[in-house]
Amino acid sequence: PCKQGVSSVASLNHIAQQIYNPKSKKQYKIMKSGVVQWVLKVGDKVINKQNKYQIINSDGSVVDIFNGNLGIIKDIKDDYILIDFQGIGYVEVPKSHAPYIELGYAITCHSAQGSQFDTVIGGIDFSMFIMLNKELLYTMITRASKKFILCAQTKALQYAITKEQIIHRQTYLMDDLDELCNKKFDF
């Protein structure tokens, strides 16, 4: 799904949070221009959307987190959110970075690139018309290591299967590499 709209990541995350984590009392509201954008709760699956370097945990350890890191919120304190990030461990994310921590029950195909999940539920509809193509569908399917479920409008799926996004670009990369590789080096 795309970021905004009826069938968007934001909508799906809101619904998933209500189903999977409805009762968590500890929460932190992410505000923008005085309006609640989303609510983070203990137990939520989240995704970090911006690199943050040199986070100093209370035990003195220094940790970096990167765009696309997934985790689970373990606690919410006055000045930080404790998140258990996959492959990193527990990180005390300062609340100043909280606007870059989004719900991660549903993520965009772009955010999922480079990741693998046991089960992926992919969605295709005409709300993301401009993005519909074979490459998007391929990326979506190949994120699943065991099971892929597709929820699609039939016409949108037919359109995606017939449209290619790859643009053939004219570059001089091969010429430059050929020239570089054929140079003689004096040592």
Listing of model-derived features with the role each one plays in the protein:
Residues 1-67:
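Conserved helicase/translocase motor-coupling segment
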